[in-house]
C-alpha cells in the first residue's frame, strides 16, 4: 500500500458511519452475548486458538452476528472471504471455491467463507457449498435472522455448530452508547458530548436490543 492508498483508506475510515467506526475488532471489545463468548465458552476458545469449524450465527438484527464474523476475520490466520446471499450468484461462489482450493493446495492455507443472510441462498446454492464444507475446502460461517433449522440445508446444519445470539440487554446498549460518546479516535469523544443517565435510559429503551 503506497502513501496515496493509505491516506485514502484513512479518509474512508474517518467518514464511515459511527456504527461502522465503532464496530469491535477484538473479542474483548464485544459487548453482550456472554452465553457464547464468555471466556469459558467454546466459541471464545475456538476464536482465540484459531481452530474454527463451520458455524451458523442466528438471532435478531443488531445482535452482533456480522460483528463476530469481523472479529474472526481480524484474528484468524485463514483467508477470510465473504458473500451476501442476497446478491451472490453461482459465479461468485465458484470463484471463492476456486481460490480456496488453490490456497489449500499450494500453501496449506485454510479459507473461511462468511455468508451473510445465508437463508437467502436457495437449496441449489446451499447444496453447492456442502461438499466443500465436508472436505475442508472452506470453513463456513453463516449469519441469519431466521431459524436455521427451517431455512438452512439440514446437511449443512449437521456439519456446523449453531450459536443463537440474543437481543442486547439495556445495560449492554448503555455501555455501547457511553463508548461511542467518549472514544476520541473512532467515536464522538472529541465533541465533549455529555449523555446523562436519563438520555441513555431512553435510547436503550427504544433500541429494542438492537445495537
Functional labels for PLM-detected ranges:
Residues 1-49:
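A short, basic N-terminal segment
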Residues 1-11, 45-83, 98-101, 130-135:
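Walker A/P-loop
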Residues 36-41, 78-112, 123:
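Short glycine-rich substrate-engagement loop in P-loop NTPases that contacts/grips substrate
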Residues 44-48, 115, 119-158:
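Conserved catalytic/switch belt of AAA+ P-loop NTPases
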Residues 84-86, 161-174:
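Conserved AAA+ ATPase "SRH/arginine-finger" region at the nucleotide-binding site
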Residues 159, 175-189, 206:
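Conserved AAA+ ATPase "sensor/coupling" helix adjacent to the nucleotide-binding pocket
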Residues 189-206:
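Short conserved motifs of the RecA-like P-loop NTPase core
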Residues 207-211:
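The conserved phosphate-sensing helix
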